[in-house]
């Protein structure tokens, strides 16, 4: 039983990697994983949490390999942005099937497919209890979806960016390779930078730090972990200003 029955956060930005949607598949979207994630988001909405979502596109397209093979980086990034729109459409559909009101906003205009990103409208929708999915990254090449998550989190005045990954927090080393890797429960922004811990790319991380936006890294593949994070239970790694 939770020692903290009230949610720890009122408005969140949930960042999901595209890879998280693959499940056990090597590519694309696993429908079972998609539906489970939609159900977990539904639980938050039922708790009265305002939820914004940013999804990566790595399950459908990775631009780095093609860029190394000679493709123009801007073209590759545009393709990656469109991959995030495809994931966003899938998530919106899964939420609608779970009877959750959701809107998809894209940083690139896609008339007839989804809404254009509008900051004021997004906040209004969140206040009305709708889940808002932000697609197409920031709309600019050379910016990761982690940067988009931090940017949108700051814009919608979220209390935290929740980064759902394949591991249950931030470790001193890669836990997949180093059996002696130690998990951190709480870190300051400076500790992450000084120890060169892999949380997200530097541009995204410094954006969060400069705007005092806490980041909580947790394992989205672990059933119930998202709810535990929201309820303030010990789950994942919490990165914030400790001064």
Curated annotation (Swiss-Prot):
Could you tell me which HAMAP family the record lists for this protein? PyrH_B (MF_01220_B)
> What keywords would UniProt list here?
Allosteric enzyme, ATP-binding, Cytoplasm, Kinase, Nucleotide-binding, Pyrimidine biosynthesis, Transferase
Q: What PANTHER family is this protein classified in?
A: URIDYLATE KINASE (PTHR42833), URIDYLATE KINASE PUMPKIN, CHLOROPLASTIC (PTHR42833:SF4)
Q: Which domain of life is it from?
A: Bacteria
Q: What is its main location?
A: cytoplasm
Q: Which Pfam families match?
A: AA_kinase
Catalytic activity, reaction form: UMP + ATP = UDP + ADP
Name of the protein in its database record: Uridylate kinase
Pathway named in the protein's UniProt entry: Pyrimidine metabolism; CTP biosynthesis via de novo pathway; UDP from UMP (UMPK route): step 1/1
Q: Describe its assembly.
A: Homohexamer.
- Give the record's family classification: Belongs to the UMP kinase family.
Q: What is its EC number?
A: 2.7.4.22
Location of region: Involved in allosteric activation by GTP:
23-28
Q: Which InterPro entries match?
A: AceGlu_kinase-like_sf, Asp/Glu/Uridylate_kinase, Uridylate_kinase, Uridylate_kinase_bac
| Activation and inhibition | Allosterically activated by GTP. Inhibited by UTP.
- Residues where UMP binds: 57, 77, 138-145
This chain's function reads: Catalyzes the reversible phosphorylation of UMP to UDP.
The keyword RNA-binding is assigned to this record: no
A molecular function (GO) held by this record is: UMP kinase activity
The terms describing its cellular component in GO are:
cytosol
